[in-house]
Amino acid sequence: MSTLVTCSLPGAVTTHASTRRFGGSQFQTSQASCISFKREVSAKAVLRSVRCNATQTQSAQRKSSTATVKRSDPKGKIQGPKLDDGSGGFPPFRFGKGGGGGGGGGGGSNYFGGFLLFTCVLLLDYLKEFEKNLIARRQRAGYDANNDMFQQ
């Protein structure tokens, strides 16, 4: 519900009053939207006019809301946040089906991530040994070839 109210002064003050409802309570607000003068009028007279319009509006009653705070634990014990006990559950970062469990105790029966890491380290160690043996064979073969050239 909105009304348009004008004031009778040498100039005109147009106010826009609107009524709003919030949770069963009714509020009415007034806002000056346009002030125009044909002659010079003191600012004091304009303010009196606006005050008059504001007092002529309907008074609003505000219902106070009450809130009841209920304790979650009737015995008064304070509960802290739930911490991870290391049992199953989703880890923070889960790649595939494995991944090492959820942050706390290691992961329980889900050991695929550790097995994969161990396998990769074992493979790299094997490749390192294989490369050492390959280099040693080449050096021996090259040394033997050089000796044969000098003997002929």
UniProtKB/Swiss-Prot annotation:
Q: Which residues form a coiled coil?
A: none
Which stretches does UniProt call biased (Polar residues)?
52-69
Region spans: Disordered: 52-99
Q: Which domain of life is it from?
A: Eukaryota
Q: Does the keyword Mitochondrion apply?
A: yes
Record GO biological process: chloroplast organization; thylakoid membrane organization
Q: What is its main location?
A: mitochondrion
Q: What's one GO-annotated cellular component?
A: mitochondrion
User: Keywords of this protein's UniProt record, alphabetized?
Assistant: Mitochondrion, Transit peptide
Compartments annotated for it: namely: Mitochondrion
Transit peptide segment: 1-52
Q: What does this protein do?
A: Restores fertility in rice varieties with LD-type cytoplasmic male sterility (CMS). CMS is caused by genetic incompatibility between nuclei and mitochondria within male reproductive organs. Corresponds to the functional allele of RF2, which is dependent of the presence of Ile-78 in the japonica cultivars Fukuyama and Owarihatamochi (AC F1SZ42), and indica cultivar Kasalath (AC F1SZ41).
Q: What is this protein called?
A: Protein FERTILITY RESTORER RF2, mitochondrial
